[in-house]
Amino acid sequence: MLTVQFDRLPIGPGTVFLDAGAGFGRHAFEAARRGAHVVALDYAQEEVVVTRATFAAMFEAGEIRENNFVGVLRGDATRLPFPDNSFDCIITSEVLEHIQDDVAALHELSRVLKPGGVLAATVPSWFPEKINWMLSDEYHAPHVVGGHVRIYSGTEL
């Protein structure tokens, strides 16, 4: 399931695209299908491994062209390993609520975004998120590594 409306974003042939917090790569795969040059970045090594394997299978199946794939990297959104002004479009979907220093992550994403580029960020809706926190300690940090560290309100967005 895509959590970003791709038709509203300038993603097409030649777009240099970053999926920051790619997880298992669903947004990276869609950008590659649309012809973008894709970098998928995630903090979790196991997700990086799975995403690399999925990209390889997509090449083999002819779903995407090899020149649309730049790489899948393990990295930290608060310390991105890219030069300034590297990407035309960045998606960080359902990621910021996992990052202790979300402001630092947003600064980094802005730093690597080209002037005039587009950053699309999504976070979970407040009400369902609140219910999940109440129902299970395993949903959020510190009870689970990589869990949610905050619930965003409308005013924080």
What are these regions (language model features)?
Residues 1, 26, 43, 50, ...:
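S-adenosyl-L-methionine-dependent methyltransferase catalytic module, highlighting the catalytic core
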Residues 1-13:
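Conserved alpha-helix/loop element of class I SAM-dependent methyltransferases that forms part
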Residues 14-23:
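Conserved class I S-adenosyl-L-methionine
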Residues 24-35:
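Conserved SAM-binding loop of SAM-dependent methyltransferases across substrates and taxa
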Residues 37-42:
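Conserved SAM-binding motif I beta-strand of class I
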Residues 62-80:
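Conserved SAM-binding strand-loop segment of SAM-dependent methyltransferases
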Residues 78-89:
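A short acidic, Gly/Pro-enriched loop at the edge of an enzyme's catalytic core
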Residues 92-95:
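A short beta-strand submotif of the Rossmann-like class I SAM-dependent methyltransferase core
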